[in-house]
Structures are given as C-alpha cells and as structure tokens.
Amino acid sequence: MRPQATLTVLPVERPLVGRVSPPGSKSITNRALLLAGLAKGTSRLTGALKSDDTRVMSEALRLMGVQVDEPDDSTFVVTSSGHWQAPQQALFLGNAGTATRFLTAALANFEGDFVVDGDEYMRKRPIGPLVDALQRMGVEVSAPSGCPPVAIKGKGGLEAGRIEIDGNLSSQYVSALLMAGACGKGPVEVALTGSEIGARGYLDLTLAAMRAFGAEVQAIGDAAWKVSATGYRATDFHIEPDASAATYLWAAQALTEGAIDLGVASNAFTQPDALASQIIASFPNMPAVIDGSQMQDAIPTLAVLAAFNRQPVRFVGIANLRVKECDRISALSNGLCAIAPGLAVEEGDDLIVTANPTLAGTTVDALIDTHSDHRIAMCFALAGLKIAGIRILDPDCVAKTYPGYWDALASLGVSVQR
C-alpha cells in the first residue's frame, strides 16, 4: 500500500486560466490494448494513457507473450501472434476493473490455466455475474468469493451460442463478452436482460473499438448483438483524451469563472462521461435531479460541484458506484459531511447534496478519506479551490488514471501543500 500522505489544495483568488491537455482515455486505451493483443500483427496506439491501470494491462499482455513497446509517453506499439501463452504466475491487475473483466473473458479463447488476480481492493469488487455468464457458455472458470482471484481453464475458444446477461449490471461485463466473442469458435450472441441498460455509452465505445480492429458485429434489436468469429486485425488506432479527466478541469473552470483550454471541444468526445459538460456549464444552477446512469465516472466531480450550487441536487441511477474502487456514494457523502455536517445525505442508492454556496471562502478542518480511490482524490481537490483546510488522504492514488493531475493544477496556478 502507498503511505498515507496528505495533500492540501490552497484556495485560489482568481479565475483559473490556461491550457491543459488531459491524458488519453483509460477506457479506450485498455480496450485498444486488449484488441491489439488479440490481433495478429503490429498495432500502433497513439494518444494512449500511461497510468497504473494501463500499465497492469500491458504487463499482463507481456507475460503472455505479446510484445508491447512504448516509444514515447503516449504511444503503445503492440505486436502479437494472436495466440497467448499461459504464464507461470497469476496475472496481477491491481485495482483495474477494465483489465480484470476484459481479460477474464478473453482468456477463455486460449489453451492453458490462467489466474486473474488483483490487490486488496480488487478482491472486494464483484465479478460473479461475468463468471456465471462464461460458465453458461461452457467455459471452465471459477471465482469462489464472487470477486477475484478468478481461475480460467482455457480450451481454445468460446463456444458459439447465445448468452444473456443483466443489462443493469456493470457494462464492463457486457464489453468483456462482446470483445471475447470475436475470437470464439463460432458466432456469439450477447443479449441484455433487465429493465434498463446501464452505461450504454461504454458499450458504444466497445463496439466502435471492435469494428476498428476488424470485428464484424451486428445489432439485433436494441439490446443484443451478434459477433462473428472473425478475430481481429492489427491496425493503427488513435485514442481521444479522457472525458472523466476533463470533468475536473471543466468544473475547476466553472468554480473559478476561469477559461481552461483542453485542446478539444466538449462535443468532440465519444465517451459518455462528456455528457457532464452540459451540466457543469449550467453551474451554479445545476438541475435538482441528475441521472448518473450514463456518466458514472463523472458523478464524483458533479457531486462536489453541487456543494456550491444554488439548490440541492439529488443524484439517481448511481447504484453501481458502490462497487467501484470503493463505495463512492458513501465516500462522497462522508467527504462532503467532513467539510460541513449535513452537506450530503444517502437515501438508498441515491446521493443528495444539500448545497451551500456560502461555503466558498470559509476555512474548515476536513480530512478526506479517499480510500485510495483516484476519483475521490481528484474531485475533492475541487472543493479545495474554494475552501481552506481540506486535506486529501493518499493523494498519489491519482496515478491510477491521471498521474499528472497535481501538475496540471499547478500549471494553472494552483498551489498545494504536502
């Protein structure tokens, strides 16, 4: 574990003005790394994120015989035979949910015994629904605790057929099945059940990446897809900036009435979390109810921004935040209440931020427990722009997805104390 250091963001007294280039998208980078590893040939991935989450994915591929070179700080060059070898050791994936779920399904397409494992936090994050789905497809896979570690006995390819999975659950399970399906022994149909489809935008990211790497995917109605067993073709692939990272900068601009140029328009993103830009633009008149189901990684940003809104905000459709890197609903509620008692309330799986714009300019004594969750650390830094005395525990956990976050704030004139 990282040492429990703290960091304090010092309030700013002027608008934040400058240019910051957000890092590449974590979601797209790990999809592209997986697909490049499954493809035969050499793929060049530009604009990529280099962080803890993408490092564990690239290292896992290397352990299985895939060559992954890094000629610069935003490029991966992936050369693969299209066949992975079972390593002698477990694939350790830290607390990277994308890498863990995506690899668990993909490994069913290869021969050998594999173990997918993670750190103490990943070992508390559910993977049972994906394991159950793979078992129904004939894969020999087990995760006795319902969380990693996961043992997979690969038999050379997913069997052709149809698999149903609850669309209310994590979109990462669905993406994992879709991406693995193209390397199976025959066509695979993935159908969603349930009353709602959570995080549909992330499925669109998956389908776009699959098609870019040569997969043939056909939509069957609104909630099912047929994936042909074509495999993947190596390709050059550019990765857009991370929309979740952009939300912190959009919010910093809104809070300080600044002008931060990200080098990309908010409507140019394909990632679903970019939807938050419209809500941030409405600050300090954010809506009374915000449905977070399609932009879950943006909710921490919006929740802290809502603390300074002119009216209370209820966040709905965010139940999956309880099984992210930590229980983000509770972490947000506890952190906001550390700043001001009663500033947030949990009602079931909803989060209500009561809002108090008069907090700006005050001084508090608040220690924010991030639970080593990068998004909790980054979002509460925003509160520090307006309120003195907010200390953030384990600030270096931002390395999971945005290693340069504190430097980015410094480049805009924000001072921090460690």
From Swiss-Prot:
GO cellular component terms given for this protein: cytoplasm
Gene Ontology process terms (BP): amino acid biosynthetic process; aromatic amino acid family biosynthetic process; chorismate biosynthetic process
Main enzyme class: transferase
Pathway: Metabolic intermediate biosynthesis; chorismate biosynthesis; chorismate from D-erythrose 4-phosphate and phosphoenolpyruvate: step 6/7
Keyword Thylakoid among UniProt keywords: no
Reactions catalysed: 3-phosphoshikimate + phosphoenolpyruvate = 5-O-(1-carboxyvinyl)-3-phosphoshikimate + phosphate
Main localisation: cytoplasm
Residues in coiled coil: none
Alphabetical list of InterPro entries matching this protein: Enolpyruvate_Tfrase_dom (IPR001986), Enolpyruvate_Tfrase_sf (IPR036968), EPSP_synthase (IPR006264), EPSP_synthase_CS (IPR023193), RNA3'P_cycl/enolpyr_Trfase_a/b (IPR013792)
Enzyme Commission code(s) on record: 2.5.1.19
Active site: D297
Pfam families per the UniProt record, alphabetical: EPSP_synthase (PF00275)
Protein localization: Cytoplasm
Binding of phosphoenolpyruvate, residues: K26, G97, R125, Q172, R328, R375, K400
Sequence positions that bind 3-phosphoshikimate: K26, S27, R31, S170, S171, Q172, D297, N320, K324
Keyword Cell membrane (UniProt): no
Molecular function as annotated in GO: 3-phosphoshikimate 1-carboxyvinyltransferase activity
Biological role stated in the UniProt entry: Catalyzes the transfer of the enolpyruvyl moiety of phosphoenolpyruvate (PEP) to the 5-hydroxyl of shikimate-3-phosphate (S3P) to produce enolpyruvyl shikimate-3-phosphate and inorganic phosphate.
Family recorded in the similarity comment: Belongs to the EPSP synthase family.
HAMAP family: EPSP_synth (MF_00210)
The protein, known as: 3-phosphoshikimate 1-carboxyvinyltransferase
Gene name of the record: aroA
